[in-house]
Amino acid sequence: MMQNTTVPILSLLNSRFSPKEFLQEPVSQEHYKLLFEAARWSPSSYNRQPWFYYYSLQNTPGFETLAKSLVEGNAWAKKAPLLILGCYIDSDEHGKNAYAQYDLGQSTFSLVMQAQALGYYSHQMGGFDREKAKTLLQLPPEHIPHVMIAIGKIGNIDKKDPSRTRKETLAKKVE
């Protein structure tokens, strides 16, 4: 599904959107390993790589555990073949990392774009109970849950949310 952009952009970016309908087609081990490899090679401040992901495939106990932390409005994500919880690590042996959340975002974007290149779509969500996720998954204290990602082949796009308009102005030249 191509968007109407004001200037041509990469087709991978142009076709990206966040569906709420996924086909019940599993994500292969080869493919989800590629997603995490793409995330691994993301840039990060001082190469600290302050991200960690927890993932599970549909119809497994781990998937049910991840899904339990979703808010009611994101119950649709339980139909995705793959759920991923992205965490940032805000301090390490070098001290506090003020860019940890930003770096997790870059890593997650790399993961999402790799998924897109493989023919999958993803939907990133903040709508989940972070404390519940920490408790249910027994996360180490330094792993701070920040984003949940549903990934799969796109389902019935006729059911998708109507597209939202994009900002007309998002940058200003400084002279």
Spell out what each predicted region is.
Residues Y88, G127, K153:
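Short secondary-structure boundary segments
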Residues F52, F128, V147:
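Residue-level "edge-of-site" marker
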Residues N74-K79, L83-L85, L139-P162:
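A glycine-rich helix N-cap at a beta->alpha junction
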Residues Q58-F63, D90-D92, E131, G155:
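Short, charged/polar surface micro-motifs in flexible loops or helix N-caps
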Residues M1-L82, Y88:
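N-terminal amphipathic, basic helical "cap/leader" segment at the start of enzyme domains
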Residues N4-T5, I9-S11, S18-P19, P26, ...:
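C-terminal helix-cap and adjacent tail motif
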Residues R16, L137-L139:
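Conserved acetyl-CoA-binding loop of GNAT-fold acetyltransferases
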Residues A39, I84, E93-L136:
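Small-aliphatic-rich amphipathic alpha-helix that forms the alpha element of a beta-alpha
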